Amino acid sequence: PVIDNALAAGNPIPDELADRAALRQQAATEYAKPLPDDLRALFPDEFTHTDTMGWIPKGWGIRALDQVADYMNGLACQKYPVQDGEHGLPVIKIRELRSGISEQTDRATASVPKKYLVEDGDILFSWSGSLLVRPWTEGPGVLNQHLFKVTSDAFPKWFIYLWTDHHLQDFIQIAADKATTMGHIKRDHLTAAKVVVPSGDVLGAADRQLGPAMEKAISVLLQAQALTKLRDALLPKLLTGEVTVIGHPLRTDAQTCRRRQP
């Protein structure tokens, strides 16, 4: 939209953005529908050059990644064992972030400081070993060390998630370059990673679209988890005939599987 506005206003396009501007002009004449006027009006019609991010829309800002979000490291959960008579909560480590809760998952007491408790929809980022960032959808748990819970009081969840994900490949390369036993990043790498922050009006308009979209994506992941658990619970019972299908036990003998002869 900024390129479109600049072209419409006759403002200069930076050389670095010339190819993109040409594509926008071609798209506008061939098939693309322009944004509604009220949305286009939210965007500037000029660019300004910055040392850290190159050309950005005029009036927008640049901040460090750890200025737009709080990256809270987890606990050494072995110091918080399950208490007598308590079922406890799963300990969320890198393995759980990557593969989910399993029988091998450790457990810790639920009586940890509230900020270390994880709920569905929280954004988790493993900063050591296998670097991953994703919304958590495996139910309540306790955040282990080597994982960040990513939150923000000032910016939407989708904004901090997408910008963390945007820098993920750079973080992975940093961790790989300095790996000894287990590669990792440090907090100063979060400070070095920069974020382009749009105007409040643009951010608000984007949030009205992307906020519900992200919540829908998380909801779909939760539904997939529920269906997976249902499948895992029912399949063994179906195979043994303990559960019937349309009122009949599922047959698994050789006669059932034998092809009919013509």
Where are these regions (language model features)?
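Sequence-specific dsDNA recognition surfaces
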Residues: 45-51, 66-81, 88-120, 143
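Non-catalytic DNA-recognition/assembly elements of restriction-modification systems
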Residues: 37-76, 200-205, 211-247, 252, ...
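Short, glycine-/Ser/Thr-/acidic-enriched flexible segments
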Residues: 70-73, 96-99, 130-132, 155, ...
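Extended, domain-scale alpha-helical bundle/helix-rich regions
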Residues: 1-31
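A generic secondary-structure signal for well-formed alpha-helical elements
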Residues: 2, 6, 10, 72-76, ...
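Proline-centric
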Residues: 55-56, 147-157, 173, 188-216
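A short beta-sheet element
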Residues: 93-94, 113-170, 174-180, 186-187
